[in-house]
Amino acid sequence: MANKLRHIAISVRDPEATAKFFEQAFGMTRAGNAQRGVYMTDGIMNVALLNFGDEPIAGMEGQKNVTGLIHFGMWVDSVEQVDKAITAAGGSYVTGRKETGPNVYYEVKYKTPEGIVFDVTESGWKGAVKEVAPKAKAAA
């Protein structure tokens, strides 16, 4: 298996209204509730629509009323291996740690050399699918 982009977090003022927009405009469905909003899915990707209010956002401390892309997430085979690759490529650790329980969700956050925040996990996100089977070709 390979590392896969499977998560995007967006800071929005009204998660419910934004979720309805994603449903109507893109045909996405709700994958579940988040602590600060709603998880949406297209069947492969997870899009978290979150209202952080006045709470600090990991990697964006000190910024107020942030809207837009907060971070992206990579579903990886091994957090330990990708940690080494991230560090070797110039990335830096922000927060989080790998959990040991099989049914425990976790993510570890990093920054790219330019300061773009992203997270990695081996456990995935609600509504996301790591491996996608290719569609069978129609008979000619």
Question: What are the language-model segments listed below?
Answer:
Residues 23, 48, 73-75, 79-80, ...:
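A general secondary-structure boundary signal
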Residues 52-56, 123-125:
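Acetyl-CoA-dependent GNAT
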Residues 2, 9-53:
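Core segments of cupin and vicinal oxygen chelate
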Residues 4-13, 41, 60-140, ...:
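Vicinal oxygen chelate
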